[in-house]
């Protein structure tokens, strides 16, 4: 296991004072990306105005690509296969689509910890603890945000370094110390759809999913694992429709 400078950061992102539980919202079906973006932006405004609570929103999108603020246009290899959206989040190009669980995280970091680097580390830990419930060892990397799995079953791309694939991506934005956008975990995603981009600008490593790792796990199973791990790191939740 590789160690990173983020390993020492605290994974406790619970509120520093008593606070209502985080709303836990799950949407069935596919949510169009512009609709999700509008929802998040409005929610951030309302959290800042103290007329809405923090929320985690679990959903799936139809197949599409999003470009983060660091995206290189040359990394969009096949521009017309799926819609492409400017996301406004950090990061580069990524794919979203059916079979991928997205969790948009709208939290007030002023009530928790005003440290974006530590927040990203906590999000990574959330994913790592989620995957551990399925006996998958997820790892972070010093120079790559997200969560990775080592693939000893595959040939090395870089001599002397075991192959590894990305199973979960992180891309956030923080406005007035309120986070939005979030994480995505590949459950049974069609991995061929990543061929239209250079995912997150990384060429030396691939992508994987729970199904690709030999685990035919349902989205519902992943949701339960996400909730358990989230509450360990960020505090209690309450289900909302």
UniProtKB/Swiss-Prot annotation:
Segments forming domain BPL/LPL catalytic: 50-238
Q: Which spans are transmembrane here?
A: none
Give start-end ranges for the coiled-coil region(s).
Answer: none
Q: What does this protein do?
A: Catalyzes the transfer of endogenously produced octanoic acid from octanoyl-acyl-carrier-protein onto the lipoyl domains of lipoate-dependent enzymes. Lipoyl-ACP can also act as a substrate although octanoyl-ACP is likely to be the physiological substrate.
Location of this chain's protein in the cell:
Cytoplasm
- Family under the similarity heading: Belongs to the LipB family.
Using the record, list the residue span of the signal peptide; answer none if the entry has no such feature.
none
Name of protein? Octanoyltransferase
Which InterPro entries does this chain map to?
A: aa-tRNA-synth_II/BPL/LPL, BPL_LPL_catalytic, Octanoyltransferase, Octanoyltransferase_CS
Q: Which PROSITE patterns match?
A: BPL_LPL_CATALYTIC, LIPB
Tell me which residues this entry annotates as catalytic: 200 (acyl-thioester intermediate)
Task: Extract one GO BP annotation from the record.
Answer: protein modification process
Pathways involved: Protein modification; protein lipoylation via endogenous pathway; protein N(6)-(lipoyl)lysine from octanoyl-[acyl-carrier-protein]: step 1/2
Q: What is its main location?
A: cytoplasm
Site entry (Lowers pKa of active site Cys), positions: 166
Per the UniProt entry, the Enzyme Commission number(s) are 2.3.1.181
Q: Which GO terms describe its molecular function?
A: lipoyl(octanoyl) transferase activity
One GO cellular component term of this record is: cytoplasm
Q: Where does substrate bind?
A: 89-96, 169-171, 182-184
Catalytic activity line of the entry: octanoyl-[ACP] + L-lysyl-[protein] = N(6)-octanoyl-L-lysyl-[protein] + holo-[ACP] + H(+)
Mention any additional remark.
In the reaction, the free carboxyl group of octanoic acid is attached via an amide linkage to the epsilon-amino group of a specific lysine residue of lipoyl domains of lipoate-dependent enzymes.
Record keywords, A-Z:
Acyltransferase, Cytoplasm, Transferase
